[in-house]
């Protein structure tokens, strides 16, 4: 019976789900907006909301809980230093999910999950390969 089963399995093992959501949390905090499938976005939302609440509470113990959940110290720093002060007057509802059509290939429902009042410049920052200036000048 499926009584009391509130979370989706997403066709993954428990370890894979935990790692995937840790990576997605770090990506969302870094870029403040990510595109994913709708079921993943719906499962990610409460995890991120709880992380922002941890950031708002502050303290070393909450920081360690966030590191254990996300496994990315740089993004935990951003969570506590940038996002927590931004949402200090907001009681929940830090993220929104916007439906984004269907993916070509498998027709999966896609969605954009983003922070409310997000920083527009954070999208795509520090993503992908970078070219070193010294190599570009030598060529």
Curated annotation (Swiss-Prot):
According to the UniProt record, one GO cellular component term is: cytosolic large ribosomal subunit
Q: Is Ribosomal protein a UniProt keyword of this protein?
A: yes
UniProt cross-references to InterPro entries, sorted A to Z = Ribosomal_bL17, Ribosomal_bL17_CS, Ribosomal_bL17_sf
Q: How is it modified after translation?
A: May be methylated thrice, on undetermined residues.
Provide the leader sequence positions: none
Region described as Disordered: spans on this chain: 120-139
Q: Which Pfam families match?
A: Ribosomal_L17
Query: Which molecular function terms from Gene Ontology are attached?
Result: structural constituent of ribosome
Q: Which PROSITE patterns match?
A: RIBOSOMAL_L17 (PS01167)
> Where in this chain does the entry annotate a coiled-coil region?
none
User: Which residue ranges traverse the bilayer?
Assistant: none
Key words of the record = Ribonucleoprotein, Ribosomal protein
Please give the biological process terms from Gene Ontology that the record holds.
translation
- Its domain of life reads Bacteria
* Oligomer and partners: Part of the 50S ribosomal subunit. Contacts protein L32.
Spell out the HAMAP family in the cross-references: Ribosomal_bL17 (MF_01368)
The family classification in the record reads: Belongs to the bacterial ribosomal protein bL17 family.
Descriptive protein name: Large ribosomal subunit protein bL17
